[in-house]
Amino acid sequence: SCMKAAPMKEVSIRGQGSLAYPGLRTQGNLETLSGPNDATRGLTSLADTFEHVIEELLDEQQVIQPSKENKDADLYSTRVMLSSQVPLEPPLLFLLEEYKNYLDAANMSMRVRRHSDPARRGELSVCDSTSEWVTAAEKKTAVDMSGATVTVLEKVPVPKGQLKQYFYETKCSSKGYAKEGCRGIDKRYWNSQCRTTQSFVRALTMDNKKRIGWRFIRIDTSC
């Protein structure tokens, strides 16, 4: 499967520092989750909570539009995080998407949901993948949009000091079907191979002329 990134900004939500994702949009109508039984009512309350969070994130978009004084306001993505320590969880946007998919499934009957559960049907992905946060010190260099190799800076200066750049990378697992071909493909008739694919994200880098700036670089994002 392929993970998508969306713009991310660091903002303050209700007086607390947090990471907001104004690019997030929901699909479908969460109000359709309401139903006659108690189980559905419980899911409706979860849907209302999720919808409220999304509305807050969308409201913040009006506050954090980039201005002339803040040229770097729109330079973050969900796969790049500036932090003083290693993030303990995957990017928030991915968690929100998984939760939204759960709510969408909640609109089906219990029987349909039971049969649609991948764990119950024995569903497996075509290619196995692993995801983890890596530092600029581990990446060292990357390729930008022009094809040039640039140095990925480990630390980013901020008003109160420095923060490290972390990248959430997804790549094909070295175990399982990575070398034997894609799962579910008939090897008698087809040749297949699981390959790690890359996408561009914005990061603070330095080119071979020692010029420092925000550039789009390639990182591993799916298998």
From Swiss-Prot:
Gene behind the chain: BDNF
Molecular function GO terms recorded: growth factor activity; nerve growth factor receptor binding
A biological process term (GO) from this entry: nerve development
Keyword Cell membrane: no
Propeptide residue interval(s): 6-114
Similarity remark: Belongs to the NGF-beta family.
Signal peptide residues on this chain, from the entry's feature table: 1-5
Alphabetical UniProt keywords: Cleavage on pair of basic residues, Disulfide bond, Glycoprotein, Growth factor, Secreted, Signal
Organism: Chilabothrus striatus (Haitian boa constrictor)
SMART domains per UniProt: NGF (SM00140)
Origin organism lineage: Eukaryota, Metazoa, Chordata, Craniata, Vertebrata
Pfam family, one: NGF
Cell compartments where the protein resides: Secreted
Name the record gives this protein: Neurotrophic factor BDNF precursor form
Role description: Promotes the survival of neuronal populations that are all located either in the central nervous system or directly connected to it.
SS bonds (residue pairs): 127-194, 172-223
